[in-house]
Amino acid sequence: SAVDYIFSINYDITGLMKPGRNGIGVTLASGWWSEAQTFVVKNFNYFGDKESLLAKVVMKYEDGSREVFGTNTEDWKYFGEGPYLFSSYFAGEQYDARRAEVYETYSLPEFDDSTWEKPVVVDTVMIEEFCTMPGFGRSWPAVHEQKPEYIGEYDAPVRIVDRRTAKTRKELFPGVYLYDLEQEMAGVPRITLHEKAGTKIIIRYAEVLYPDLPEYAGKEGTMMLENYRDATSTDVYICRGGEEVFQPKFTFHGYRYIEISGVEHAPELEEVESLQYSSVTEFHGSLTSSHKLLNRFAENVSWSQKCNFINIPTDCPQRNERMGWAGDTHIFCHTALNNSSLKKFYERNLQAMRDLQTPEGQYPEIAPVGGGFGGITYECASIFMAWELYGQYGDIRTLEKFYPGMQKYMDYMKDKGLPGTKVNPAIGPLGDWLAPEETDLLLLWNAFYYKEADLMSRIAGALGRTEEQHQYEALAAKVKKFWNETFVLPDSGKTCNADGTLCDTQCSYAIALSYGVAEDRKRIGEHLIRKTRAIGYTVGTGF
């Protein structure tokens, strides 16, 4: 994790080099480094509070010699009054194009930097800050004050993978225009403007509009922003004058609608374009059928994957959270790997989870920031993801690398005394999250524990660890027996809570079949059909 090391990125700049003298210029912004994390408002500067640069250019000549030009305080210059007035990865960007001239040619060798300052050396020491999540008894981890190591980035960079122009335009109020992309996207706009110098353009984003309901009287058809929470998702552009293009560089938004205000000349539809960012550069898997609704569902899944795989697997692309919740990550892993080639992407996530594992063996519920309050349904993600990666790519090295951490986690779970008990260990509230009907947490936790033990036996077998394979097989059998004796009513075959009261939820039957913990699969399957038919063949679970 960033607590222990910082990723360095390599670029091949051969194609940018020209004969003779060359120059290099770099613009710094917050990014993940000093942005707010964990949706707790005060958690800005999460990893560090100073944007800084450590770089070198390695030149290899035809005669085999090489020369290195590195950052230093003598040859490099710094300027802090450029056109970027404000930049936040989640909140947006403010850009004054009138000030752009002072640095437009800053990467050319003939640029005059005589008025610029000499930079100073900044130690790469992490700040120490943490916040407690009220009501859950868990805190986001302190960021240790230490000097991290530098390691090479081994995941593919985020790219622009799709483009889409606005489909409709509507004037909401004088000078306020709403553009509809007719598709949820995650990225930035590219807008062509024709305004006078000094004109201040405000650009906002939304996923949905207020519906025509009494409680929203006067707001219907305008942008609903409540689901963005503290993410203001607003860009500001101050025009230089004439035709100019604004494309934010140091932020990203999740949106379908773009609101542009402050303009005298509303951009045409073809002048409002959205650029989709993603770590998913191409899809190898697809689903096509004769059913239009099913096809659209499959398309939505692909778009959701593109929008939520930006450096890390996030829970949402728009609000102030955008965190790598492990439960979301491992549940979707099988689908993601069938859709796209993401071996390095997921191995990076596994690495972050292992790095954040506690000395006792507990995995984090969130990576790479750590912390959370999910419990077993989230902490087990490493086991699920490692097995999915092995099944997809057959690379035994993935299992070898992460197996010791998984063993440590299983020992931690054994010490917690979770399986085989009706005592609520209060290890986290996240089960079938936000479901219309509640499923007993112990039913879910023990189903997950069975699946963990089952997968660990398979992993140990793949690694040739026969003794450990048998140990995990025995544990899985024990938990499975306990689950069926505790959470299934013998007469009706319906699921029940740990106290013997009726559970009978769609989730309880689905998890029993999916994870293989049910002994009487036929009866459990019949109850799942009954529950699904009763709600019109819809999904009645949470996530």
Task: Report residues per predicted region.
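Extracellular/oxidizing-compartment recognition motifs
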Residues: 1-318, 327-328, 344-347, 363-368, ...
